[in-house]
């Protein structure tokens, strides 16, 4: 039986125990959080095991689920610690783990089979068949890519068995999650390891082919998206079949969690949204709001453009008069509030409205702030902080408990009995050996009994009714206290047991009846070899002429113009003529509404009879089987193979070659190659793709402002981004109008070819998609010469003339 259809879950973030309690109190149905290790918010406070144990206990008493993020790529040296960590999570009753790396899933299934597997948005699940693939591996839930439209979400929910989780509020990455290398290649901090430095929140200039900026200087935050806010679309998402509505924010403050979760609780319960709820969401931390992906209106309006930080709640405007600033408000604010002025040139000024300001009226202040005079749109950035920590004494989400004190008997002697009943009907009965006695003077009153039994401040219960036997009985406070404690313990145990049993009864059985194994394995008898990835016919010819023994063609074509389907026959013919291995690649991203069209391309690929097909998305296995493909399959970089267990997973599917993560060091690749039964291929030359985004800066700022009806200026000339340090990042677009941001430095590993081959890397790939054909031929021929010993490798030291090259992550690890 599937959990799908039984619940509608509001899923809250928690980066600290205080935030966790706020999420519980605000009405969350489930809470996701990270431990001190192995999670994608390494800079949050996060939870130690003891703290996590208490959090799980409290949540389960309230029938709230707890999901722990284990959503990063795992290195081989971490696997032993990871296994113990998952065992620890299992022992404390964690309901599910959120996973990116298939190695984590495989280990969890082996050592903690009761823990549910949830596929992270880092898995880039953007199609129904991606969800079905993860269903077949035992995942009970998949978090969809944030780039999907409502129509795509509806289609996926309707046809899958797994639960679907969708982000509805909070920060948004500009790159498809799980496919971003920008932070790690620029500064060594990887989003795939939970340490993203957020280069997308920095300013950039958009340059044309002449190197000239095409935008005003203050329009600089071209990669910084506004925050998601689907509050107006909750009913549509509910109707679509979404199970879990996820709020981003494990790094946010407790006030944010309390306000946003409480507001979404009201919206879900009332099945409508009111103006006060809109204002509540606007007053919390936000960079401005967008629904562009859900409504399929991707473009300029979804980006912050002039300010990537907290926008605040719009509350009026400022103007100047006789050397003073006037704050004209649409509503009153508290003294001590922080307001932000966004000026027309994009500059931002903050004022603290303290007692230095003159309150002309509830909605008008004037002052001479030291920060200077600023005129523009007025936003409420924050209100005075209440730093008081709230414990269970002040906690409001509690069970009402009725208690009945009575006298029990075993036939020989009497004893004291207490029955506690919750509004749900759950009841427990506890006993005490105390024999009720007739009071000599003053019997214990109902008020006294109520006082003792009502001392429930540090529990999740509150006393709503008390009943005691008729008669002048005396009930010592010590007996009443013991009965109260025992009843609370019994209720907590019963509630936790109910939650755990209900949760464990829920499972998903995938309905994909496919044998994923490749039908044929390609024999690489001539390794080592040089391969070339190209996306033009002239590039194919140049690479073959340079001596490449393998051509990888297609996939993410770095050109807006789509291929004619006949191109695949032509590439296969050219490769066959020269006895060169012909491999066709899939894109790194295929959205759900693109699947049917892409299958026509894939059909042409299959009919061209390549030697192999290299997949960047796991669901391609399903599509190839549907098309009757019986050839070899290879695993490429989009699959994020980061360790030996993940390698072995793909080997079991009879994959012929593996191209592991580009964030691995040479030492890590060597470890994988040592345990691999198939050739390992890695990129050694070319411009690495740093980002792939559904959003396109060219369409947004040079075209029409959105991808709809874009005149495709990218076809007429090239564009690039320039950062604060003067680095130039070329922009390329593909036939789906996606934006690909390339590295500013060209990878060049010619000096290390002998070392790479000695370390067990069998195939060295030149990525020539960003090169002219003549350069492709020259570079490929040099790698062939060095690999075969007919040409000497250049010096390893990078001189001043070679400062524009990079060694990637071969000798520089990631955080």
Predicted regions, residues:
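Active-site pocket-lining/capping segments in soluble small-molecule metabolic enzymes
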Residues: 2-125, 143-147, 151-244, 251-649, ...
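Short, conserved phosphate-binding/catalytic loop or strand-edge motifs used
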Residues: 129
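Long, basic N-terminal domains or extensions that often function
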Residues: 140
């Amino acid at each position: 039986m599937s959990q799908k259809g039984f619940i509608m879950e509001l899923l809250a973030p928690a980066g600290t125990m205080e935030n966790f309690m706020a999420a519980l109190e605000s009405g969350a149905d489930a809470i996701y959080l990270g431990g001190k290790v192995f999670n994608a918010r390494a800079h949050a406070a996060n939870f130690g095991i003891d703290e996590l144990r208490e959090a799980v206990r409290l949540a389960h008493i309230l029938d709230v689920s707890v999901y722990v993020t284990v959503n990063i790529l795992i290195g081989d040296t971490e696997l032993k610690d990871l296994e113990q960590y998952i065992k620890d999570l299992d022992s404390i009753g964690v309901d599910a783990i959120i996973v990116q790396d298939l190695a984590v899933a495989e280990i969890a299934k082996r050592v903690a089979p009761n823990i549910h597997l949830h596929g992270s948005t880092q898995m880039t699940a953007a199609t129904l068949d991606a969800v079905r693939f993860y269903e077949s591996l035992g995942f009970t839930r998949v978090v969809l890519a944030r780039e999907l439209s409502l129509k795509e979400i509806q289609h996926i929910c309707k046809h899958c068995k797994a639960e679907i989780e969708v982000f509805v509020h909070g920060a948004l990455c500009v790159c498809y999650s799980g496919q971003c290398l920008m932070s790690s290649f620029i500064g060594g901090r990887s989003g795939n390891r939970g340490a993203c430095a957020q280069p997308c929140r920095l300013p950039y200039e958009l340059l044309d082919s002449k190197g000239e900026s095409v935008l005003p200087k203050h329009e600089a935050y071209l990669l910084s998206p506004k925050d998601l806010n689907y509050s107006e679309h909750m009913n549509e998402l509910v109707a679509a079949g979404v199970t879990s509505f996820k709020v981003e924010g494990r790094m946010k403050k407790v006030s944010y969690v309390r306000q946003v979760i409480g507001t979404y609780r009201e919206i879900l319960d009332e099945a409508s949204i009111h103006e006060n709820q809109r204002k509540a969401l606007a007053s919390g931390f936000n960079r401005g709001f967008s629904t562009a992906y859900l409504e399929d209106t991707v473009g300029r309006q979804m980006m912050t453009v002039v300010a990537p930080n907290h926008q605040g709640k719009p509350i009026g405007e400022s103007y100047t008069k006789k050397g003073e600033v006037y704050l004209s408000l649409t509503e009153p604010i508290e003294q001590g509030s922080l307001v932000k002025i966004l000026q027309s040139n994009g500059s931002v000024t903050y004022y603290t409205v303290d007692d230095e300001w003159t309150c002309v009226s509830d909605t008008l202040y004037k002052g001479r702030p030291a920060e200077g005079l600023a005129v523009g749109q007025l936003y409420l950035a924050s209100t005075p902080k209440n730093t008081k920590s709230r414990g269970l004494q002040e906690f409001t989400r509690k069970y009402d408990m009725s208690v009945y004190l009575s006298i029990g008997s075993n036939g020989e002697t009497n004893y004291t009995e207490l029955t506690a009943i919750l509004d749900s009907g759950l009841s427990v009965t506890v006993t005490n050996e105390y024999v009720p006695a007739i009071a000599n003077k003053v019997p214990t009153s109902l008020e006294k009994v109520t006082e003792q039994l009502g001392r429930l401040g540090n529990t999740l219960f509150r006393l709503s009714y008390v009943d005691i036997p008729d008669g002048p009985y005396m009930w010592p406070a010590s007996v009443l206290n013991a009965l109260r404690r025992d009843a609370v313990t019994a209720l907590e145990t019963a509630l936790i047991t109910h939650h755990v049993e209900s949760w464990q009864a829920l499972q998903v059985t995938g309905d994909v009846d496919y044998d994923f194994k490749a039908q044929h394995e390609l024999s690489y008898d001539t390794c080592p070899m040089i391969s070339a990835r190209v996306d033009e016919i002239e590039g194919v010819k140049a690479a073959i002429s340079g001596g490449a023994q393998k051509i990888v063609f297609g996939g993410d074509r770095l050109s807006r113009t789509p291929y004619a389907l006949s191109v695949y026959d032509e590439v296969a013919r050219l490769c066959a003529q020269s006895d060169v291995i012909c491999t066709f690649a899939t894109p790194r991203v295929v959205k759900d509404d693109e699947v049917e069209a892409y299958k026509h391309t894939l059909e042409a690929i299959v009919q061209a009879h390549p030697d192999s097909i290299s997949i960047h998305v796991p669901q391609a296995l399903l599509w190839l089987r549907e098309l009757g493909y019986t050839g070899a399959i290879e695993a490429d970089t989009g699959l994020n193979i980061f360790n030996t267990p993940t390698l072995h997973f793909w080997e079991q599917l009879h994959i012929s070659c593996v191209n592991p993560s580009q964030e691995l060091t040479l030492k890590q690749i060597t470890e994988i190659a040592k345990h691999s039964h198939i050739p390992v291929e890695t990129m050694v030359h070319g411009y690495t793709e740093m980002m792939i985004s559904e959003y396109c800066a060219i369409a947004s700022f040079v075209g029409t402002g959105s991808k709809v009806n874009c005149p495709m200026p990218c076809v007429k000339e090239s564009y690039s981004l320039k950062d604060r340090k003067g680095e130039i990042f070329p922009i390329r677009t593909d036939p789906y109008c996606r934006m690909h941001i390339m590295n500013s430095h060209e990878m060049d590993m010619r000096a290390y070819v002998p070392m790479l081959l000695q370390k067990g890397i069998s195939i060295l790939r030149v990525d020539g998609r960003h090169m002219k054909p003549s350069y492709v031929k020259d570079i490929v021929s040099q790698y062939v010469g060095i690999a075969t010993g007919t040409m000497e490798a250049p010096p390893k030291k990078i001189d001043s003339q070679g400062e524009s090259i990079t060694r990637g992550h071969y000798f520089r690890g990631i955080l």
